[in-house]
Amino acid sequence: MSQRTVFFISDGTGITAETFGNAILAQFEFKPRHVRLPFIDSVDKAHQAIRQINHAAEVEGKRPIVFTTLVNMEILAVIKTHCNGMLLDMFGMFVAPLESELGIKSNHRVGRFSDASKSKEYDDRIEAINFSLAHDDGQSNKDLAGSDVILVGVSRSGKTPTSLYLAMQYGLKASNYPLIPEDFERRQLPPALVPHRKKIFGLTIAPERLSQIRNERRPHSTYASLANCRHEIHEAEAMMRREGIRWLSTTTKSIEEISTTILQEIRPERLEY
């Protein structure tokens, strides 16, 4: 398939348009060129966006795909009227039916979804991020009891990015702790974790993938060798089984999939779905 451009247009950051659009595009086997156009909050900026869209249409000989979460109806009308792209108005698809169902009108407020700077949710997320950073890779045992979840696994199995995603996306205090050769020799969890067994969730990974990741960091080392990775994974999984720890393989899963699975398993009481 020849080159095709996808635009994500918003009068805010464009993150919602891009996230939703990418979820839809993932259903199709092609790799478009992505262009995010955030803060399109005036008619002048709308016309600038239109020029970019129409230029792509002319160069590529195909209509660009345009995902939009524009709230301002005047700006949206300008885009609809003058752009030569296939327009997918994601808010428009849902707002009108919801207005009808709820019997109330949308306030069409720009940035309402992301305007969290004054909210408790925002404060909770900042606190959770700071907590997760302070408890990354077992660097602090202080207040482990305050963790919503404690991730364990061998080095480079995905603990840190998952912890930070849980903190940033859900406001969860996620600690993570490495399982190291000394733990395998003792055949026991690190002593600091034992009192918090119910909060522990394990991450494992295919040895081949682990070796590949470690070689990017420390090539040709014992640490990154396939034999060592196989040994560590075998011991870590055996420990998780002995200790009755819930666990999953991160080998083929995205951070979002890993986090969603963890949430389904731990179901923190304070988290509303």
From Swiss-Prot:
Q: Which residues cross the membrane?
A: none
Role played? Bifunctional serine/threonine kinase and phosphorylase involved in the regulation of the phosphoenolpyruvate synthase (PEPS) by catalyzing its phosphorylation/dephosphorylation.
Q: Which InterPro entries match?
A: Kinase-pyrophosphorylase, PSRP
Q: Which GO terms describe its molecular function?
A: ADP binding; ATP binding; phosphotransferase activity, phosphate group as acceptor; protein serine/threonine kinase activity
- EC code: 2.7.11.33, 2.7.4.28
Task: Please state what class of enzyme this protein is.
Answer: transferase
Which keywords appear in this protein's UniProt record, sorted alphabetically?
A: Kinase, Nucleotide-binding, Serine/threonine-protein kinase, Transferase
Reaction(s) catalyzed by this protein? [pyruvate, water dikinase] + ADP = [pyruvate, water dikinase]-phosphate + AMP + H(+); [pyruvate, water dikinase]-phosphate + phosphate + H(+) = [pyruvate, water dikinase] + diphosphate
Family from the record: Belongs to the pyruvate, phosphate/water dikinase regulatory protein family. PSRP subfamily.
Quote any Pfam family the record assigns: Kinase-PPPase
Sites where the protein binds ADP: G153, V154, S155, R156, S157, G158, K159, T160
UniProt-recorded name of the protein: Putative phosphoenolpyruvate synthase regulatory protein
